């Protein structure tokens, strides 16, 4: 007569649970039929994998794991020795009787065993745990650390119009004004020949929950320190545009921040962190991160409506006595989010004011230069961060013999930005997302430019920019066969926004451009997808500003094709 005693894993002392389990698994294959043997092998593989993971993560040492396995082996041998001899059938073969365990019960046992082992390792240590308080602390710290990242491989073809204005014409007869300082300074600059390049972008982020209210973050990325908008690394390139010959890449700190959440919905951030404002790449480039201090607040208004607001102060440069004044950005944004309908439809709208302080160019004088020791120009808009498009004027003194050329911004910048996004959930997983963005520079004006530049009458340029975009498909590419396509049009006036922070891809970067964008994404595996984007741009105004009613037209058209392979983890 056989007696079956039911015993669940939870009824065993935690200090003996794994040892007895492994012992049973070691003895099991010798007592089981084919199907039961397969199930036991699966369970044994699960437990052994769990033990190896605990060793790898420092929760228990390899010596402890080996000792556990030896104890389990001895227990298995003891169990087999104590077992009664099996019955023998008429054919002389041993008869094995195995009680039936339903699949649902076996699955529950596996899950419960895993939970019990993990629970025991999260304890405070002591006799009932492994590794004591130090290992428990490691396990706890690991549970509060989040690691994420992505890698993008890009092939890019840039086709510049054969009828584009040559670089030499950008500076002929125009000494004091420009909208393309890099081309103005180099009469041999390329404005007509096509460019092909391959690029890689890699980002690795760490986010640690210090407490429930405090988060610290750090992100490393490829890319240089000479521009804020891009984290791309061009292959086969060395320093100062020399050939790379397998030269290694440099990593930069792209984010380093501490975020506080003292109240529900309120987030205070300091350091270098992700863009806290709703917007598009018409104003802020996709890869741009902010540095400074910001506060964001989200508040539900009712079951469908919620409000949000963000504000921040961001230093651009600090005051250097006798050399330069402080420059900064002060920003505020407020908006609403409406969830409507029986499907997950949403309408999100926001209005923002981005006000720059101290960035306008100041015309230098002979007196300035003669009274200040080791004098340098104080309001230059430098080549390390500017792109193209903003109206610039020569800020150097007009004194005889001063042949240097340094450029300053002819306009101030106080940008009023209105952004809206309508997300319509259609049949199945498909969404139609319509996006609009309109921005105007409240500090732009020909009279202001004339006073600032010392009498230069600029009669062209624009303070207005807008973007419209429609996207159809899955909102996010996460699984294989996910896809979306989009089409957009933009027109960004020369001085609608500061050209340093807008898109670095459209029209080769900067402002004073208009045109179309077509794009598509397709998932090939989980968190792995292909992207294609085509951009076609032309100028809005001449790159040589119209001075005193004398126009100097320029042409600069660019078609850009980008093909990407993306992997996210």
What is each residue range found by the language model?
Residues 2, 6, 37-38, 190-191, ...:
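Outer-membrane beta-barrel pore domains
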Residues 2-7, 21-188, 569:
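N-terminal periplasmic/intermembrane-space "pro-region" immediately following the signal or transit peptide
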Residues 143, 196-200, 249-254, 287-291, ...:
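Residues that define the transmembrane beta-barrel architecture of outer-membrane proteins
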Residues 149, 202-208, 256-260, 293-297, ...:
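Residues on the lipid-exposed face of transmembrane beta-strands in outer-membrane beta-barrel proteins
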Residues 153-159, 220-226, 274-276, 299, ...:
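Transmembrane beta-strands of outer-membrane beta-barrel pores
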Residues 155-201, 206-264, 277-285, 403, ...:
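Surface-exposed loop and membrane-interface regions of Gram-negative outer-membrane beta-barrel proteins
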Residues 212-216, 264-268, 302-309, 341-349, ...:
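Repeated loop/turn-to-beta-strand initiation elements of outer-membrane beta-barrel proteins
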Residues 227-343, 348, 352, 357-407, ...:
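Surface-exposed coil loops of outer-membrane beta-barrel proteins
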């Amino acid at each position: 007569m056989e007696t079956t005693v039911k015993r669940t894993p939870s009824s065993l002392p935690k200090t003996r649970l794994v040892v007895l389990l492994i012992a049973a698994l070691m003895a099991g294959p010798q007592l089981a039929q084919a199907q039961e043997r397969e199930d036991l092998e699966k369970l044994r593989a699960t437990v052994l994998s769990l033990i190896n993971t605990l060793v790898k993560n420092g929760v228990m040492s390899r010596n402890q794991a080996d000792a556990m396995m030896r104890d389990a082996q001895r227990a298995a041998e003891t169990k087999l020795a104590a077992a009664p001899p099996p019955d023998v059938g008429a054919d002389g073969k041993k008869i094995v009787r195995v009680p039936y365990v339903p699949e649902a019960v076996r699955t529950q046992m596996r899950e419960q065993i895993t939970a019990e082992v993990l629970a025991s390792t999260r304890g405070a240590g002591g006799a009932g745990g492994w590794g004591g308080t130090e290992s428990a602390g490691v396990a706890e710290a690991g549970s509060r650390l989040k690691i994420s990242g992505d890698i993008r491989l890009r092939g890019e073809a840039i086709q510049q119009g054969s009828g584009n204005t040559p670089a030499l014409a950008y500076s002929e007869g125009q000494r004091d004004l420009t909208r393309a300082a890099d081309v103005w300074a180099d009469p041999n600059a390329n404005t007509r020949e096509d460019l092909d390049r391959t690029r890689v972008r890699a980002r690795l982020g760490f986010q640690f929950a210090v407490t429930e209210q405090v988060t610290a973050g750090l992100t490393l990325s490829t890319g240089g320190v000479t521009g804020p908008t891009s984290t791309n690394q061009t292959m086969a390139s060395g320093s100062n545009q020399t050939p790379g010959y397998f030269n290694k890449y440099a990593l930069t700190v792209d984010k380093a921040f501490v975020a506080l959440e003292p109240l529900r919905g309120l987030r205070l951030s300091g350091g270098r962190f992700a863009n806290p404002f709703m917007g598009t790449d018409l104003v802020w480039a996709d890869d741009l991160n902010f540095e400074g201090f910001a506060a964001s607040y989200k508040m539900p208004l009712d079951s469908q409506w919620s409000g949000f607001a963000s504000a921040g102060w961001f230093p651009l440069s600090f005051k250097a006595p006798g050399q330069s004044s402080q420059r900064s950005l002060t920003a505020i944004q407020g908006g609403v989010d409406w969830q409507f309908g029986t499907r997950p439809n949403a309408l999100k709208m926001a209005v923002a004011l981005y006000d720059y302080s101290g960035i306008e160019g100041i015309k230098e004088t002979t007196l300035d230069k003669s009274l200040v020791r080791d004098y340098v120009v104080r309001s230059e808009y430098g080549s390390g961060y500017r792109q193209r498009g903003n109206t610039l004027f020569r800020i150097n003194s007009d004194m005889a013999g001063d042949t240097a050329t340094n450029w300053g911004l002819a306009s101030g910048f106080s940008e009023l930005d209105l952004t809206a996004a309508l997300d319509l959930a259609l049949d199945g997983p498909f969404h139609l997302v319509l996006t609009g963005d309109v921005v105007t520079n409240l500090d732009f004006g020909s009279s202001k430019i004339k006073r600032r530049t010392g009498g230069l009458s600029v009669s062209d340029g624009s303070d207005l920019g807008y973007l419209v975009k429609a996207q159809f498909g899955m909102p996010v590419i996460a699984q294989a066969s996910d896809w979306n396509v989009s089409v957009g049009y933009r027109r960004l006036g020369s001085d609608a926004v500061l050209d340093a922070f807008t898109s670095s891809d459209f029209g080769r970067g900067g402002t004073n451009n208009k045109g179309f964008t077509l794009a598509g994404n397709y998932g090939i595996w989980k968190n792995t997808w292909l992207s294609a984007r085509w951009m076609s741009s032309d100028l809005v105004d001449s790159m040589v500003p119209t001075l005193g009613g004398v126009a100097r037209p320029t042409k600069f058209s660019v078609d850009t094709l980008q093909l990407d392979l993306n992997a996210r983890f």
